[in-house]
């Protein structure tokens, strides 16, 4: 599941990092987008492993609404993360929402035992509005992380979460 907001207005914003990563995975693996319950979905095959790319058609704070029938242990949730420097990609299993309303919605629907691929967008400048920042256009460093985040999703699918964490969470 890639977190983001629907519509062109939000397509290139920091908060839509999850949608952008799913678009990259779709580009790599093909498939066909279809309308699903409160989401767009595409079935893809990654190294022989079947996966569903799911982009909620709801706004961020209602993302969990698209998860009817899904279990936490079957999910990889890709999202923007203010607490990581722009361009950083990290993999994590479990945890809290950390102030992220999309994650809060997902956790309220399925619990917190899912894998996360976190795309760092950095913090806004001192005194700047956080909402305006996350809904602002993604900067170059964060954009360049999108293919690496797609690599991280593929690694989780191919090698498992622990191997993906070892690979993507290592300090350079």
Swiss-Prot record:
Q: Which domain of life is it from?
A: Bacteria
Assign the protein's first listed, main location to one coarse class.
Answer: cytoplasm
Q: Name one GO biological process term.
A: protein quality control for misfolded or incompletely synthesized proteins
Keywords for the protein's UniProt record, in alphabetical order: Cytoplasm, Hydrolase, RNA-binding, tRNA-binding
Q: Does the keyword RNA-binding apply?
A: yes
Q: Where in the chain is the site Discriminates between blocked and unblocked aminoacyl-tRNA?
A: 5
Give the GO cellular component terms, alphabetically: cytoplasm
Query: Can you say where in the cell this protein is located?
Result: Cytoplasm
Q: List the GO molecular function terms.
A: peptidyl-tRNA hydrolase activity; tRNA binding
The portions of this protein that span the membrane are: none
Q: Which residues form the active site?
A: 15
Pfam families for the chain: Pept_tRNA_hydro
Give residue numbers for the site Stabilizes the basic form of H active site to accept a proton: 80
Q: What is its EC number?
A: 3.1.1.29
Question: Where does the chain bind tRNA?
Answer: 10, 59, 61, 101
PANTHER family, A to Z: PEPTIDYL-TRNA HYDROLASE
**NCBIfam families from the UniProt entry:** pth (TIGR00447)
How does this protein assemble? Monomer.
Protein task: Hydrolyzes ribosome-free peptidyl-tRNAs (with 1 or more amino acids incorporated), which drop off the ribosome during protein synthesis, or as a result of ribosome stalling. Catalyzes the release of premature peptidyl moieties from peptidyl-tRNA molecules trapped in stalled 50S ribosomal subunits, and thus maintains levels of free tRNAs and 50S ribosomes.
Q: What is this protein called?
A: Peptidyl-tRNA hydrolase
Give the source species: Rubrobacter xylanophilus (strain DSM 9941 / JCM 11954 / NBRC 16129 / PRD-1)
Q: What is the lineage of its organism?
A: Bacteria, Bacillati, Actinomycetota, Rubrobacteria, Rubrobacterales
């Amino acid at each position: 599941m890639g977190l983001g907001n629907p519509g062109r207005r939000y397509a290139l914003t920091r908060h839509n990092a999850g949608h952008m990563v799913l678009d990259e995975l779709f580009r790599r693996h093909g498939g066909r987008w279809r309308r699903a319950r409160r989401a767009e979905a595409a079935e893809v095959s990654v190294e022989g492993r079947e996966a569903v790319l799911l982009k909620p058609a709801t706004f961020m704070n209602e993302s969990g609404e698209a998860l009817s029938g899904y279990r936490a242990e079957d999910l990889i949730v890709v999202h923007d993360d203010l607490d990581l420097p722009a361009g950083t990609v990290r993999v994590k299993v479990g945890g809290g929402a950390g102030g992220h309303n999309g994650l809060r919605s997902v956790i309220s629907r399925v619990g917190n035992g899912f894998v996360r691929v976190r795309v760092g967008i950095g913090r806004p400048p001192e005194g700047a509005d956080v909402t305006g920042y996350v809904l602002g256009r993604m900067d170059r460093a964060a954009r360049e992380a999108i293919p690496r985040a797609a690599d991280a999703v593929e690694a989780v699918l191919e090698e498992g979460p622990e191997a993906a964490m070892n690979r993507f969470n290592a300090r350079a």
